[in-house]
C-alpha cells in the first residue's frame, strides 16, 4: 500500500477523523494511488465492520405523481417518463413482497413511497399494519422511506415495529438548489434528526453523477458524519429519459469506486451500501465495491428500474468468499 495511505488508514483506525482538505485531495487519486485508496478503505472497513456483506431489498409501494422536482427522479410530476403511477399498494402486497425479499436473501426490507410525505390516517395506518404482520411472519427487518415526517409519525412507525428510517439528502447542501427547488435542504436534515430522536436507526445517503463537484461529494459525507447516521446508501445516476438529467453521462467505474472509498474513510464505522445505478455505472467492476469499502448492496429491483437477478449477486458473493450478514443487525 502507498505509505501515506497506509499511515492514513492507521490514523483512522486509531480514531482520527479525515479532514475536508485531506478528503478533497484524496478524491483526485489516480493510477496506482487510486488502488492504494481502495486498499486503505478496505482495511478500515474490515477493521470496523468485519468481512461480512449486508443485503437489502425495497418495494416501490406508491409510485409517481410526486410534487417535488428532483432533477434525477422519474417519479416527479414535473417530468414526463414511463415510470408507473399507482396509489399505495394494499397490505397483503406489502407483506408478500417482504416474504419474497426474505426468500431472496435480504435481511432488510424497505417500504418506499413517492411524494413529499405520507398521509396520516389510512396510508400510514396501512403501512403500520403491514409492518406488524411482517414482524410476526418473517425475520426480515422492516424499514420505511416515506418522505419528510414529523416526530409523531416517527414514533408511530417505531411503535409499529419499524427499525430503520431511510431518508436521503441526495447531494450536498451547496448543490441541492440545482437539483430540487420545491423544498428546502433543511427539511430533509430535520427529518433525519426527528427520526433519530424517535429512536429509529437512520439510513441516509445520496446520489452521484448529478453534476456535483468532488468537493461537494465530500461536503455531503461531512454532513452525514455530523448527523451521525447509521447506514449510508450510495447511488449513482442512471439517467432516465424525460427527466432533467436525461442527457447526463454515467460516472466511470473507477470514479464510483473512489467515491465509495472516500465515504468509507470519512465514515469509517458506518454501514455503506451501493444501491441504484450499480449495474450501469460499475459494469464489470461491480464486485470491486467490497474492496473499496462498501459493506453492503441492494439486491432485486430499484424504484422504477430493474436490477439484475438476485442469484447473480449471490454468485458474486460466493466467488468473493464473502459472508452475508444483516443490514439492520
UniProtKB/Swiss-Prot annotation:
Pfam families the UniProt entry points to: BATS, Radical_SAM
Keywords of the record: 2Fe-2S, 4Fe-4S, Biotin biosynthesis, Iron, Iron-sulfur, Metal-binding, S-adenosyl-L-methionine, Transferase
Entry EC number(s): 2.8.1.6
Record's protein name: Biotin synthase
Name of the top EC class for this enzyme: transferase
Oligomer and partners: Homodimer.
Origin: domain of life: Bacteria
SMART domains: BATS, Elp3
Cofactor binding comment, as recorded: Binds 1 [4Fe-4S] cluster. The cluster is coordinated with 3 cysteines and an exchangeable S-adenosyl-L-methionine.
Reaction(s) the record says it catalyses: (4R,5S)-dethiobiotin + (sulfur carrier)-SH + 2 reduced [2Fe-2S]-[ferredoxin] + 2 S-adenosyl-L-methionine = (sulfur carrier)-H + biotin + 2 5'-deoxyadenosine + 2 L-methionine + 2 oxidized [2Fe-2S]-[ferredoxin]
Binding sites annotated in the UniProt record for [2Fe-2S] cluster: 143, 203
InterPro entries: Aldolase_TIM, BATS_dom, Biotin_synth/BioAB, Biotin_synthase, Elp3/MiaA/NifB-like_rSAM, rSAM
NCBIfam families for this protein: bioB
Biological pathway: Cofactor biosynthesis; biotin biosynthesis; biotin from 7,8-diaminononanoate: step 2/2
Single GO term (MF): biotin synthase activity
GO biological process terms held by the UniProt record: biotin biosynthetic process
Annotated binding of [4Fe-4S] cluster, by residue: 66, 70, 73
HAMAP family with a match to the protein in the record: BioB
PROSITE patterns hit by this protein: RADICAL_SAM
Radical SAM core domain: residues covered: 48-278
Family designation: Belongs to the radical SAM superfamily. Biotin synthase family.
Cofactor(s) this protein requires: [4Fe-4S] cluster; [2Fe-2S] cluster
Reported function: Catalyzes the conversion of dethiobiotin (DTB) to biotin by the insertion of a sulfur atom into dethiobiotin via a radical-based mechanism.
Amino acid at each position: 500500500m502507498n505509505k501515506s495511505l497506509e499511515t492514513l488508514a492507521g490514523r483512522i483506525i486509531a480514531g482520527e477523523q479525515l479532514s475536508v482538505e485531506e478528503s478533497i485531495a484524496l478524491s483526485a487519486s489516480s493510477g496506482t494511488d487510486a488502488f492504494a485508496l481502495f486498499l486503505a478503505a478496505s482495511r478500515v472497513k474490515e477493521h470496523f465492520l468485519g468481512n461480512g456483506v449486508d443485503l437489502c431489498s425495497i418495494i416501490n409501494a406508491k409510485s409517481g405523481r410526486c410534487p417535488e422536482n428532483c432533477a434525477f427522479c422519474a417519479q416527479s410530476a414535473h417530468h414526463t417518463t414511463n415510470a408507473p403511477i399507482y396509489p399505495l399498494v394494499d397490505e397483503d402486497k406489502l407483506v408478500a413482497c417482504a416474504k419474497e425479499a426474505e426468500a431472496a436473501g435480504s435481511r432488510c426490507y424497505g417500504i418506499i413511497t413517492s411524494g413529499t410525505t405520507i398521509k396520516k390516517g389510512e396510508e400510514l395506518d396501512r403501512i403500520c399494519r403491514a409492518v406488524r404482520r411482517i414482524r410476526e411472519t418473517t425475520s426480515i427487518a422492516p424499514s420505511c422511506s416515506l418522505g419528510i415526517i414529523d416526530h409523531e409519525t416517527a414514533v408511530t412507525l417505531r411503535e409499529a415495529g419499524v427499525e430503520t428510517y431511510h431518508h436521503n439528502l441526495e447531494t450536498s447542501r451547496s448543490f441541492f438548489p440545482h437539483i430540487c427547488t420545491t423544498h428546502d435542504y433543511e427539511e430533509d436534515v430535520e427529518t433525519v434528526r426527528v427520526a433519530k430522536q424517535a429512536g429509529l436507526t437512520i439510513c441516509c445517503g445520496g446520489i452521484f453523477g448529478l453534476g456535483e463537484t468532488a468537493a461537494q461529494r465530500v461536503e455531503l459525507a461531512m454532513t452525514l458524519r455530523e448527523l451521525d447516521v447509521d447506514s449510508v446508501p450510495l447511488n449513482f445516476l442512471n439517467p432516465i429519459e424525460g427527466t432533467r438529467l436525461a442527457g447526463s453521462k454515467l460516472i466511470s467505474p473507477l470514479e464510483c469506486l473512489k467515491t465509495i472509498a472516500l465515504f468509507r474513510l470519512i465514515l469509517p464505522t458506518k454501514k455503506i451500501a451501493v444501491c441504484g445505478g450499480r449495474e450501469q455505472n460499475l459494469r464489470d467492476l461491480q464486485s470491486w465495491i467490497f474492496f473499496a469499502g462498501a459493506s453492503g448492496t441492494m439486491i432485486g429491483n430499484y424504484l422504477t428500474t430493474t436490477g439484475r437477478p438476485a442469484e447473480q449477486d449471490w454468485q458474486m458473493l460466493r466467488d468473493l468468499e464473502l459472508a452475508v450478514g444483516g443490514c439492520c443487525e
